[in-house]
Amino acid sequence: MAKQDFYKILGVEKSASLTEIKKAYRNLVNIYHPDKNTKKSAEEQKQAEAKFKEIQEAYEILSDETKRKQYDKFGHAAFDQQFGGGSSGFSGFDFGDIFSSFTSGFGFGGSQEQKYSRPLKGENFQAKIYISFIESILGKEISQKLTKYDQCDNCKGSGANSSSDITTCYNCQGRGMQTEVLNIPGFGRVQNKTTCSVCLGSGKNITKNCKKCRGKTIVETKEEVTIKIPAGIQDGMFIRVAGFGGPGHKGGPSGDLHLEINVRQHKHFTRSGNDIHVNMPVSIIDVINQNTVEVPSPTGLKKVRLYDYYKSGQIVNVLRAGAPDPKNPRIIGDLKVHLIFYIPEFSPRQKDDLNQVFAQINDKTKAK
């Protein structure tokens, strides 16, 4: 008897995403699982069991990227014991998929049973946060409501309504893994271990879900958090907010939230390392008279003494007026003041007076 199309068994299109396949599988399991049909007649139970096995087989293939590609290319023949005895059939085949299948099933990197049975930390999340240039130099505290995932306190992370609603998975006998034989063109029969298609690696079946988390084992809450941005932080750096990532597995801790700092550009200031640069227009009169001028900085005005030998474009250092090092606040950069000379406006009479003065000056720069 010819096997039915796996996509039709699950009631999904051939282009269905993995999320759609998982959703369809869970809906069908909820209908045809043996534990859901105990009150029906013997014949109906037998039909439900046969249907359930079809659903398992279809899900086992379509939920695995490698097997799904093989099925889409070769159909049921990819898993037939008589297929692949020869050395042909490599055209268009992805060897990367083959070897990823090997490494996932042959224990490279550790036991798969251990992987699914031990507590694992949740996935780390990443987000961006935008601050001004001045805030990056001075530091800032931000209060924000963040999503947090905690273990359900009603079921203690089991997902079941009570302990009596948890049974050992009949398909994998509690191991979380199942063994299968693949017939890969050019390789012959290959034994492989995959995640159990019934319990999805947990080793247990739940007959009644927890009323609070509905079997998800975790609950989602909102928590007000104060995020401290250290003084001197630079664009592209990260701040870690512990415990605000994805939910842990098997009672493991939640992952972390990594905030990428994005510093907006400033109209006047730029930064290089811990040094801050600023262009400062100064009157040539202040330079000639060697006056002291006030220069803006992120922490306020700084006084700079001008000297008559300065030239336009000269860089004047104001020590420790730059940015603090976020890892060591005792290290502080300098303020680099780029002098830009300008000539003030003069009245015609003032120009005449200046010309008389200039006529008496021996301009040595003309010889250069």
Swiss-Prot record:
Zn(2+) 2 binds at residues 169, 172, 196, 199. Zn(2+) 1 binds at residues 152, 155, 210, 213. SMART domains: DnaJ (SM00271). CXXCXGXG motif repeats lie at residues 152-159, 169-176, 196-203, 210-217. The keyword Zinc-finger applies. InterPro entries: DnaJ, DnaJ_C, DnaJ_domain, DnaJ_domain_CS, HSP40/DnaJ_pept-bd, HSP_DnaJ_Cys-rich_dom, HSP_DnaJ_Cys-rich_dom_sf, J_dom_sf. Coiled coil: none annotated. Binds 2 Zn(2+) ions per monomer. Keywords: Chaperone, Cytoplasm, DNA replication, Metal-binding, Repeat, Stress response, Zinc, Zinc-finger. GO terms for biological process: chaperone cofactor-dependent protein refolding; DNA replication; protein refolding; response to heat. A zinc finger (CR-type) spans 139-222. Its cofactor is Zn(2+). Residues 5-75 form the J domain. One of its GO terms (molecular function) is zinc ion binding. GO terms for cellular component: cytoplasm. It is found in: Cytoplasm. Belongs to the DnaJ family. Participates actively in the response to hyperosmotic and heat shock by preventing the aggregation of stress-denatured proteins and by disaggregating proteins, also in an autonomous, DnaK-independent fashion. Unfolded proteins bind initially to DnaJ; upon interaction with the DnaJ-bound protein, DnaK hydrolyzes its bound ATP, resulting in the formation of a stable complex. GrpE releases ADP from DnaK; ATP binding to DnaK triggers the release of the substrate protein, thus completing the reaction cycle. Homodimer. The J domain is necessary and sufficient to stimulate DnaK ATPase activity. Zinc center 1 plays an important role in the autonomous, DnaK-independent chaperone activity of DnaJ. Zinc center 2 is essential for interaction with DnaK and for DnaJ activity. This is Chaperone protein DnaJ.
